[in-house]
Amino acid sequence: MSSRSVSRWRRGVAVALTAVALGAAISACSPPSSGGATPHELRIGMQAGPGTLDPATINQNSQWFVDLAYSSLINAASDGTYRPGLATEWGYVGQGNTKFQLTLREGVKFSDGSELTAEGVKKHLEYVKGAGGQMSGTLATLKSIDVAGPLKLVLTFSAPNPDLPFYFAQSGVGIADVISPKGLDNKKLLGTETAGAGPYVLDSSATVANDTYVYKPNPNYWDKANVHWDKVTIKIIPNLNSLLNALKSGQIDFSTGDYTTAAEAEKAGLQTHFTPNVFSGLNLLDRGGKLAPQLADQRVRQAINYAIDRRSIVDAIYGKYGSPTTQTTHGAGYLKELDDKYPYDPAKAKQLLAEAGYPNGFTLSVVSTPFFNGDTMVQAIAGQLKSVGITLKVDSKSDVNEFISKMASAEYPAAWIGFGTLPMFVASQNLYGPSALFNAFKSTDPELTKLTNELAVAPQSQAAAISEKIEARLVDLAWYAPVGWAPLGQYATKKIDPAAVTTTTGEHPIVTIIDVKPASGS
């Protein structure tokens, strides 16, 4: 599987999963040894360390490691809104969403003392484009960067992209996290040191790779009022139970949450919050009927949706932390009424199968994986489809990378899917468009293509309405059989301000780490 394909998968799934599921296949370890925190020290638990600290090539699962030390061009608040970062103004120039202008903040210095300039940001973007990281492909259509002034750039793209603010905020780690000119002059050091304009700087002398990462305040930070901690430490704790124990014993203060340990976290008095983000269910890939002729008929795909009792599956797998859905997004495009499109109706499912010429059902091959409870979801669906005559022949791949490869290679007519909420145009590139990784058979639909082309060039004021039409079309086509929203979230001790834990949205399910601050009086 190509590195670009892996990158596209990670934008769809790993953007959403972040560090939540990283420990699924990692052996247990004991909690870290106890130790006191310095005054106003934030101690974070993560399940895996970063392979590199270079923003241009870091895995998005490791975003917090760079967000502490680098400022984004645009800041995505935990509530999903955008606010100024290194850029004070931004927006599209003219019509068509191919030109984008950025005005940079005056007087900003990086941690190494170099100044923020338009020339420096141009150099940064050119580096990210050619670095081969997860976001390099996003800049593939970046045709030119014009420096229109000491603090002003105009970016021209060869194809429209209506979601550039999404990429220039923290979601676009690599693109958004601007590296200093001095850092770019010595790229080899970017893997182990930081060269950003963020609130903190890595203390490399106190850092032990893949164990402990220590950050201290950046004396040059442009927004000193929002430096909330005297020290930030990230401790690597691979096992979920060990991570929870570290929180309960006060050895760490904050971490991502997992619904499998949520009840115990609540019982221990921790602050918990979960946001629906990843839709889990079946991806009915073979819509042209190459391997499974039955799936070429929309009535069959709709029958599969009618045959699923979503509520019972969600309750069994996610408990109160999940919610049923028939949709692919929980952000722009989500329509509450679409969740009533396919009520549990086995009789309706059998009727549609009979009308399509399959009164006795059929057998459908599905590739799955235990990752993020994929196998559990597929087996639950299989039990319900059996009652309408559809037998799932499940091939589980314990190696998630093998699963991705098989799913994307058009060797199976259906697959488990766990896909995180993204802006609709970004989803077109990753989920449902003809070149999307999750569209292995390159399915197309004239109406879907028309709407996506409209979205690509639409002004922001029209994007939500077009996204809703796209989602309605996807649900009607029944290209997928979503079952429920798998929740993502975070845990915190009472030391942390509750707002840092609870303010999240579907497109931003994990908090912006620089927004985490001490509770009042702590």
Task: Give names to the regions the model predicted.
Residues 103, 137-181:
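Surface-exposed binding/hinge segments that line
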Residues 200, 291, 322-355, 373:
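Structural transition elements
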Residues 37, 308-333, 372-382, 402-522:
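Detector for C-terminal structural segments
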